Amino acid sequence: SPTEWGVFVHEILSKIKTVDDAYDALRSYVTEGSIDENQADKLLETFKKVASVPCLRDAYSKDAIVRNEVEVFFEDSILRLDRYVETSNGAFLIDYKTGKPEKSYHDKLRKYMRALRDINDNQDIKAYLVYLGDEINVEEVMTEN
């Protein structure tokens, strides 16, 4: 089902920090029979495309400090961040989506940004929604003014 596929893609992405990690991570899923070679190749291509989007390139560089599936306690709830990255060019917050764009995703990411700014002394954070489909679609999420 699309939902199961979305959960599975998130699981795989949580194990990948750089493009170099992607191949090994995907191989392990092929070995255990979770995905076939074609799916692995398609996911590898997808990840390479995401990592090469100009506004995201720093967030996938070897020098980045990457935290995947980070849990943050904020306003009486636990927020789970898909990918939080610190680089010499600032911080990145990336949320992966496998479905259709929705306005509520922007609201959710703004809440994540508020939480991270609380923790990190108002550090500048660039936030992006990354839609993974046949096409890679990236939307920057702006803070509320």
Regions found by a protein language model. Name each.
Residues E75-E144:
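Mg2+/Mn2+-dependent nuclease catalytic core
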Residues S1-G90, H106-D107, I119, V130:
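Nuclease catalytic cores
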